[in-house]
């Protein structure tokens, strides 16, 4: 949008905040780092203002996605590309150097590098963010190797350095980090953070840098190789939450945690079962899905077919896809007949010549073409879009046939879903007055059902008559064998206290207190 930069510059006047971060090491051997929560309002809801070029960056990253990763193997450009940190709500404070220089950072379980702005960076953003000054630190050590990280809203580039990093009362010696000489984008100037501290695995660290958390464990600074997140979703309370390094705080959760093993070392990734809408299975994850617990992602991201079904159930307004309706009108009856004749669902779209493969690609790999305004500019893009819509139609029809719906009802339902197709990485609006009638959305993890109520997955922006309600669900498509993939961000982690067990390579979830 033409006025985007001017909007960003204008918004920065409203978004300067001070952080009173509390951190402590108690006599139970746990390190607690308090988090500050930023309340969503129309001025700081930046996710909806991300320029279309950022969506193109995401699409490019998805095309490069490494589908062959196994435990211990991953790609630097994977889930990190999803991130739009500008609408993140939770931040904490660290310090770098001797004497300590303070920085506000996002603690991000979905990436693994530590970066802050370099003193050598000169831009408008520098006036609103702390910068690391190596010349003022007696513990600084030069490295100089160049580094670059691609995010959803741009790239951070700079060079590696070494210095002591203070997290709470603990000091990590000679920690490698990136001094950023290029910030993510112009919109970074209105962000509430100065940098990012990754809590993922070294396998996805740019430059194979040793993460801060690894050094905490290696240097014997924590009681156990475990850390946990408690995010306070109570909008009336200022306290944002707490990260506990070295264990868990029983006051942060109720009952027992359900643990699942890490299946893809790199991210905190695990296997997940089906997704339910008001108790009814969607069927999409019957064959299994993967999920990543990601504190650096504000929303809850998942495959477009399921997100569209959720949007329909909650009345969210997305992007109307005429291409979707065209496929339903021309091929809907044929697809249904093939399903009723027990044809292989994975091969139906190739049988009717909408896909050029026989089920090996997987649903939604080319979904960016479905809603891309430029999809019609080339026959290849158009064909990919038709193929993706066909794949989604098969999934939706399978779900409806399981419920013994009539043919007419199924076709009408699929057309309604076409009207609810979300924008790539975009958010969808809902009627704030309809929250009480919206369904529960549930996730199956470790054989247990984890429910999200409407007030937990709908984000309210603003107050009174000007209040807006935004769906906490957004579309994100990764093909097999790595996908289908869900990103369980702050919407999920706010409802469920999350334990990241580095020693036993597992993730645990329990009801947050």
Curated annotation (Swiss-Prot):
One of its GO terms (biological process) is proteolysis. InterPro entries: Aspartic_peptidase_A1, Aspartic_peptidase_AS, PEPTIDASE_A1, Peptidase_aspartic_dom_sf, SapB_1, SapB_2, Saposin-like, SaposinB_dom. It is found in: Vacuole. Its EC number is 3.4.23.-. One of its GO terms (cellular component) is vacuole. Residues 25-72 form a propeptide. The active site is at residues 108, 294. It comes from the Eukaryota. One of its GO terms (molecular function) is aspartic-type endopeptidase activity. Residues 1-24 form the signal peptide. Belongs to the peptidase A1 family. Heterodimer of a 32 kDa subunit and a 16 kDa subunit. This is Aspartic proteinase. The lineage of its organism: Eukaryota, Viridiplantae, Streptophyta, Embryophyta, Tracheophyta.
């Amino acid at each position: 949008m033409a006025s985007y930069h001017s909007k960003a510059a204008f918004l920065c006047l409203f978004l300067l905040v001070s952080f009173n971060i509390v951190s402590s090491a108690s006599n139970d051997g746990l390190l607690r780092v308090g988090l500050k929560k930023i309340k969503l309002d129309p001025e700081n809801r930046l996710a909806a203002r991300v320029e279309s070029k950022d969506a193109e960056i995401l699409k490019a990253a998805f095309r490069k996605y490494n589908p062959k990763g196994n435990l211990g193997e991953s790609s630097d450009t994977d889930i990190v590309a999803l991130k739009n940190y500008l609408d993140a709500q939770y931040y904490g404070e660290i310090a770098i150097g001797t004497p300590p220089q303070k920085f506000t950072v996002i603690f991000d379980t979905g990436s693994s590098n530590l970066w802050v702005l370099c003193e050598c960076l000169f831009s408008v953003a520098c006036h609103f963010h702390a910068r690391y000054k190596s010349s003022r630190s007696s513990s600084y050590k030069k490295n100089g190797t160049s580094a670059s990280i691609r995010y959803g809203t741009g790239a951070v580039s700079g060079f590696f350095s070494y210095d002591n990093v203070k997290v709470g009362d603990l000091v990590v010696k000679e920690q490698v980090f990136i001094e950023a000489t290029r910030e993510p984008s112009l919109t970074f100037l209105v962000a509430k953070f100065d940098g990012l501290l990754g809590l993922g695995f070294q396998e996805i660290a740019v430059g194979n840098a040793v993460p801060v958390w690894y050094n905490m464990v290696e240097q014997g600074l924590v009681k156990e190789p475990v850390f946990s997140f408690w995010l306070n979703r109570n909008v009336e309370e200022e306290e944002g939450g707490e990260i506990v390094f070295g264990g868990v705080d029983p006051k942060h959760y109720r009952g027992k945690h359900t643990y699942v093993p890490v299946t893809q070392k790199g991210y905190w990734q695990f296997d997940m079962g089906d997704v339910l809408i008001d108790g009814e299975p969607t069927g999409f994850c019957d064959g299994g899905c993967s999920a990543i617990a990601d504190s650096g992602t504000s929303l809850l991201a998942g495959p477009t077919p399921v997100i569209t079904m959720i949007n329909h159930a909650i009345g969210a307004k997305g992007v109307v896809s005429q291409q979707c309706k065209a496929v339903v009108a021309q091929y809907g009856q044929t697809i249904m007949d093939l399903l009723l004749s027990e044809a292989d669902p994975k091969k139906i779209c190739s049988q009717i010549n909408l896909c050029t493969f026989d089920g090996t690609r997987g649903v939604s790999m080319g979904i960016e073409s479905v809603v891309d305004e430029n999809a019609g500019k080339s026959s290849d893009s158009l064909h990919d879009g038709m193929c993706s819509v066909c794949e989604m139609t098969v999934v939706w029809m399978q779900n409806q046939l399981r419920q013994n719906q009539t043919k007419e009802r199924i076709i009408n339902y699929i057309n309604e879903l076409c009207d609810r197709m979300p924008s790539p990485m975009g958010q969808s609006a809902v009627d704030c007055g309809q929250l009480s009638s919206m369904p529960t959305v549930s996730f199956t993890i470790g054989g247990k059902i984890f429910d999200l109520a409407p007030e937990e997955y709908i984000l309210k922006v603003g107050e009174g008559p000007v209040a807006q309600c935004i769906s906490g669900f957004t579309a994100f498509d990764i093909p097999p064998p790595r996908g289908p993939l869900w990103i369980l961000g702050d919407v999920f982690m706010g409802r469920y206290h999350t334990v990241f067990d580095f020693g036993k390579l597992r993730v645990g979830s329990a009801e947050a207190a």
